[in-house]
Structures are given as C-alpha cells and as structure tokens.
C-alpha cells in the first residue's frame, strides 16, 4: 500500500482536524464551584491544533465535526469561524429543544495559578461524539 500526497500548492488546506468541538467555560481566576460568570471559548483536542496553526502560523485550517442546530451549537460555530478555521465541513444535527437526544458538549476549565494546577471537568453526556 502506498500513499500519494499532493504538493502543498495543490491543496486547499494545510491541516484538517476531525473531532468534537465543545463549548469551553472559563471562570477566569475563580473556581468552577464559586464562579458567577464564565468566559466562553471553543475547544477540542484535535481542533485546537488546527486553530493554533491557523492563528499563529497562518496555516489554512478546516474542521470536520458535528454541531447541534441550536443557539449553543451556533455559538460554537461562530467561535470556530472567528478562530480562523473553515467551518464548511460542519454537519448540523437537529435539536429536540431540550437536550434529550443530542446536545453540545461542555468543558469547564479552571486555570492553574502558582502551585494550584489547572482543573478540567467535561460534560459530554448525549454530545454528538457519543452518538
């Protein structure tokens, strides 16, 4: 078996990532348990690589993922676009309106400070990655 790669100048993208993109909720300097508000970001292991290469090195990036066709899913989609990643390969999945069939995964991340390490809590129940 052999793999033939096209030259870079004949490719539309430098990197295409495949995986779940979640809504990341950041309580800034606070703990998740005591936070009264959160900053929102998009994130996912594979996606973060493409976004980083796009933002830092100007690489052409796209993501293959699925998002729920509701306000939270569209927020994540807008954040993907603002992050410089092409969103044309997003599959939009209908929502039941209450999250009983499918919903956008959530990730809460506390920043680490000094000796306090970062803490992450994911809520991925019924997210697209599990269906």
Regions found by a protein language model. Give the residues of each.
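Positively charged, low-complexity intrinsically disordered leader regions
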Residues: 1-33
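Short secondary-structure capping/turn segments at boundaries of alpha-helices and beta-strands
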Residues: 4-5, 49-50, 94, 107
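Gly/Ser/Thr-rich helix-start
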Residues: 20, 44-46, 67
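Short pre-catalytic strand/loop immediately N-terminal to key active-site residues, enriched for Gly-Thr
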Residues: 34-43
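Alpha-helix C-terminal capping segments
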Residues: 41, 48-60, 82
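Generic non-transmembrane alpha-helix signal with a bias for helix starts/N-cap capping motifs
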Residues: 46-47, 73
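Conserved N-terminal subdomain of the carbohydrate kinase-like
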Residues: 60-129
């Amino acid at each position: 078996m052999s793999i033939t790669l096209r030259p870079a100048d004949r490719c539309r993208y430098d990197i295409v990532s495949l995986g779940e993109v979640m809504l990341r909720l950041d309580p800034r300097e606070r703990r998740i348990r005591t936070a009264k508000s959160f900053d929102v970001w998009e994130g996912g292991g594979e996606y973060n690589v493409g976004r980083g290469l796009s933002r830092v090195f100007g690489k052409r990036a796209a993501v293959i993922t699925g998002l729920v066709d509701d306000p939270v899913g569209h927020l994540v989609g807008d954040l993907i676009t603002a992050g410089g990643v092409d969103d044309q390969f997003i599959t939009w999945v209908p929502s039941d309106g209450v999250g009983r069939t499918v919903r956008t995964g959530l990730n809460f991340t506390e920043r680490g400070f000094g000796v306090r390490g970062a803490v992450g809590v994911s809520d991925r129940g019924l997210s697209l990655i599990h269906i």
